[in-house]
Amino acid sequence: MGIKATGKRTLKITLDHPIAAFNKLVTVPVFLPQDQKFVTKVGTSRYGTSASTTVSNGAFKVASWTGSNDTYLLKRNRYYWDQKAIHLKQIRYQTVKDANTAHNLFEDGKLDDATISGVTAKSLQHDTAVKHVDRAWTYYLQVNQRAGQPLENRKLRQALSLVINRQQLTKTVLADGSKPASSFVSPGTAVDPTTKRDFSAETSTSTKVNIAKAKRLWAAGLKETKVKGTVQLTLVGDDQDVTKNVAQFVQQQVQQHLSRVKVSTKNVPDKGLQNLKSDGQFGLSQWYWLADFADPVNYLGVLQSGNSMNSGRFSDKTYDDLLTKAKQTSSQKQYWQSLRQAANRLQNQMGIVPLYYVSETHLVTHKLAGVEYHAAGETDYTRAYFK
């Protein structure tokens, strides 16, 4: 990729090949331009590691941040071009690791917008301050499809998916506004401009529980793989309470409805989880994808062969070829057609087992307005104000 400034306000970018989602791609922060003189002055290794090594051209600038403190400020930038539209003098951010603590701080008037999850979110669903933000965020099971693993067999993967009651999972286990998943790409991520339909809706398949069909597929899969005795599956995940609750639910569903299978759960800190996954020491892994930008390719690309995020080692030439075609075409019609076909192929091959679409729960003071919540990307407080 070549980049050249051809004038004060014109940037020319030359690509090796067409990228249909280019305009969305460059909204990702890693592509935002930097002040070269300032970066050179502070050094590339130090740039962006504290308030003094960060430069801003937005409505606010970073202040009181050392790089490790839990509380810092965004102060109004008096050089911002649209000063008249900015109402807040500063924004105070506080990192709160515990949802119950966040709730208490909100109740004490020390937070105006608090993100909560887990048991806390579940218990506050009827609070008038609750706001659900549907994110471009899908929670799913990665399935170990390495050679010699029992779940390399597609029928066994399909059977697992068919016994999981996603309605029960979201309504009783999570009860935080999350919704059953029927596709890898979450609703609201993108509208297919060639069909005018939500991409998630047009590529969804039924994930309704079907125990009888699951048992037939499981029996056929066991016969094909020639597995003797009990299939031992280890379900790994991080050590958060919500992850443990989901793991126990999946474990119960699988063992209740399928024969000759034992699911062991293993919940470890995130670093340990990544090691287990990279070493292939799992049968199933609880994971999620939160889109960087609002386009289906951002999801589907992580499951191409060789992608570092593809811990289950799903590999399918048809799927790979469809995504490559989508990534290299300049035709919007071809782009969206290839993505639809790829999403359908992923579902058909059961490359992963989608569980639910995450709904982020916020506690927001009634006086706060003008905040923009996005499915993909960060919450925007630029033009926020208090009524």
Where are the regions that the model predicts?
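Extracytoplasmic/peripheral linker and loop segments enriched in polar/acidic and small residues
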Residues: 1-4, 260-273, 301-366, 387
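Gly/Pro-rich hinge or "lid" segments in bacterial periplasmic/extracellular proteins
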Residues: 9, 15, 19-86, 90, ...
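Alpha-helical secondary-structure segments
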Residues: 10-12, 59, 89-90, 137-187, ...
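Bilobed periplasmic-binding protein-like "clamshell/Venus-flytrap" ligand-binding domains
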Residues: 20-26, 220-242, 285, 330-364
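Ligand/substrate-recognition segments at binding pockets and active sites
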Residues: 67, 211, 219-291, 360
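Ligand-site clamp/hinge motif
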Residues: 77-123
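Structural transition elements
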Residues: 180-220, 242-244
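Long beta-strand-rich cores associated with HINT superfamily self-processing modules
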Residues: 362-387
